[in-house]
């Protein structure tokens, strides 16, 4: 299928349009199964799922994408097509659309989305081109602006939130649940806070050990989780588990062990859940002494960050627009080349056929005469195609692919278009 902006569409939900409950409801738990279903409907499909967005990226039209998502029982999603979809993708890679403006993690997340699509054989060449261009734009924005200068990630924003609630984290005991990329970001943000102790829990104990050694913490087995919750002032949970790992009943028991000897009330526990889907079972925030925060609560951190980087975000948006214009011109130029190549391939076949007919009618002749006739046929074909080629290129480069293809069909009576479709 031809590379053309109109064949690019994006749909989904993000922190702009949905709260944590809606994000969780929209997620696709079985990514391979989703991609397999999408493969039957589109020339290419990718799935981008992070803690604050779920987006489906396809080579196809917006109407088909809407119908497909509705068939998957999804609703309330945004839907973009063509230029606006590409602008969204580039802005996303640039960090402009992120909850934490300028954060760098989205670059890796886009690369992972493409890698997962390639593994599932759903990443078409066109989608690969678009994602790689978006990554290029994201890197360029960070190189030419200060949008990520002093930027915080979602993980470090969670640490800032906890710090704002307690006033300081110095001397505190902190438990990090999860040792993946987000867990590493959280741990790195905590490393400079002069903690008394940092604990790291993970389903795979070996990974907890590796992260704990990196940041001078203590690795914790998951069967000891609630004991260390009892010891901690703050718990930040960021696993990739498909189900809650901190349960309401067990947490309630742990909070009883935190009670002050005289007052009988538990010591307050700051519990920050930045996982998607959520790590903390619903209702845990109602337990006496528990102050539960989720992705939704990180918006206030983003507002503070954005106010100091608004000028850089504007510069980044200008960079995105310039790169978008360049990319679309390249796509249109490629589209023009495809149309012109189809026309010239058809014309060459006609030239050779008619030349051979003429030579056959003329009968025996010397090599020089045959060469003159061949040269004549080439010159005539070139002259006939000159104006047509210019018109086709003008239409395609202006984005009017339909008009360019109509010209090719009119000149070739459909033969070139048919042969080109068979090779795409």
Curated annotation (Swiss-Prot):
Active-site residues from the entry? 51 (nucleophile)
Top-level lineage group: Archaea
Q: Where is substrate annotated to bind?
A: 50-53, 98, 103-105, 109
Q: Which residues cross the membrane?
A: none
Specify whether Oxidoreductase is a keyword of the entry: yes
- Report the pathway entry: Porphyrin-containing compound metabolism; protoporphyrin-IX biosynthesis; 5-aminolevulinate from L-glutamyl-tRNA(Glu): step 1/2
Enzyme Commission number(s) of this protein: 1.2.1.70
User: What Gene Ontology terms for biological process does this UniProt record contain?
Assistant: protoporphyrinogen IX biosynthetic process from glutamate
- Summarize where NADP(+) binds, as residue positions: 178-183
* Keywords carried by this UniProt record: NADP, Oxidoreductase, Porphyrin biosynthesis
Pfam families registered for this protein in UniProt = GlutR_dimer, GlutR_N, Shikimate_DH
Q: Where is this site: Important for activity?
A: 88
Q: Which reaction does it catalyse?
A: (S)-4-amino-5-oxopentanoate + tRNA(Glu) + NADP(+) = L-glutamyl-tRNA(Glu) + NADPH + H(+)
Q: What does the comment on domains in this protein's record state?
A: Possesses an unusual extended V-shaped dimeric structure with each monomer consisting of three distinct domains arranged along a curved 'spinal' alpha-helix. The N-terminal catalytic domain specifically recognizes the glutamate moiety of the substrate. The second domain is the NADPH-binding domain, and the third C-terminal domain is responsible for dimerization.
Function, as annotated, reads: Catalyzes the NADPH-dependent reduction of glutamyl-tRNA(Glu) to glutamate 1-semialdehyde (GSA).
Q: Which family does it belong to?
A: Belongs to the glutamyl-tRNA reductase family.
Return the PANTHER family for the record. Answer: GLUTAMYL-TRNA REDUCTASE
Q: How does it assemble?
A: Homodimer.
Q: Which named protein is this? A: Glutamyl-tRNA reductase
């Amino acid at each position: 299928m031809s590379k053309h902006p109109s064949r690019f569409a994006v749909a989904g939900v993000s922190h702009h349009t949905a709260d944590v409950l809606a994000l969780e409801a929209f997620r696709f738990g079985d990514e391979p199964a989703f991609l397999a279903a999408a493969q039957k409907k589109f020339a290419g499909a990718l799935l981008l799922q992070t803690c604050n967005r779920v987006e489906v990226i396809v080579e196809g039209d917006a109407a088909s994408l809407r119908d497909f998502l509705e068939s998957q029982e999804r609703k309330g999603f945004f839907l973009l097509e063509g230029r606006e979809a590409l602008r969204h993708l580039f802005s996303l890679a640039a960090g402009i659309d992120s909850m934490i403006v300028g954060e760098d993690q989205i670059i890796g997340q886009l690369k992972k989305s493409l890698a997962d699509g390639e593994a599932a054989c759903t990443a078409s060449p066109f989608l690969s081109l678009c994602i790689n261009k978006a990554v290029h734009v994201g890197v360029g924005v960070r190189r030419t602006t200060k949008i990520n200068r002093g930027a915080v990630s979602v993980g470090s924003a969670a640490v800032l939130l906890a710090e704002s609630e307690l006033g300081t984290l110095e001397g505190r005991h902190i438990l990090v649940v999860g040792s993946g990329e987000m867990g590493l970001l959280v741990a790195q943000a905590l490393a400079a806070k002069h903690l008394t102790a940092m604990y790291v829990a993970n389903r795979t104990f070996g990974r907890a050990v590796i992260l704990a050694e990196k940041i001078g913490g203590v690795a914790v087995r998951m069967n000891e989780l609630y004991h260390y919750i009892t010891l901690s002032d703050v718990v930040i949970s960021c696993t990739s588990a498909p189900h809650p790992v901190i349960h309401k009943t067990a947490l309630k028991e742990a909070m009883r062990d935190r009670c002050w000897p005289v007052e009988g009330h538990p010591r307050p526990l700051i519990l920050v859940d930045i996982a998607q889907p959520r790590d903390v079972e619903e209702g845990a925030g109602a337990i006496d002494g528990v102050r539960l925060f989720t992705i939704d609560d990180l918006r206030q951190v983003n507002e503070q960050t954005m106010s100091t980087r608004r000028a850089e975000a504007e510069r980044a948006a200008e960079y995105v627009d310039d790169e978008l214009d360049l990319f679309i011109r390249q796509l249109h130029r490629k589209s023009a080349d495809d149309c012109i190549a189809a026309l010239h391939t058809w014309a060459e076949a006609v030239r050779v056929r008619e030349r051979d007919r003429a030579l056959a009618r003329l009968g025996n002749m010397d090599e020089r005469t045959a060469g003159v006739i061949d040269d004549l046929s080439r010159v005539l074909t070139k002259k006939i195609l000159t104006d047509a080629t210019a018109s086709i290129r003008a239409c395609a480069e202006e984005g009017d692919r339909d008009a360019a293809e109509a010209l090719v069909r009119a000149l070739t009576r459909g033969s070139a278009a048919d042969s080109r479709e068979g090779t795409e």
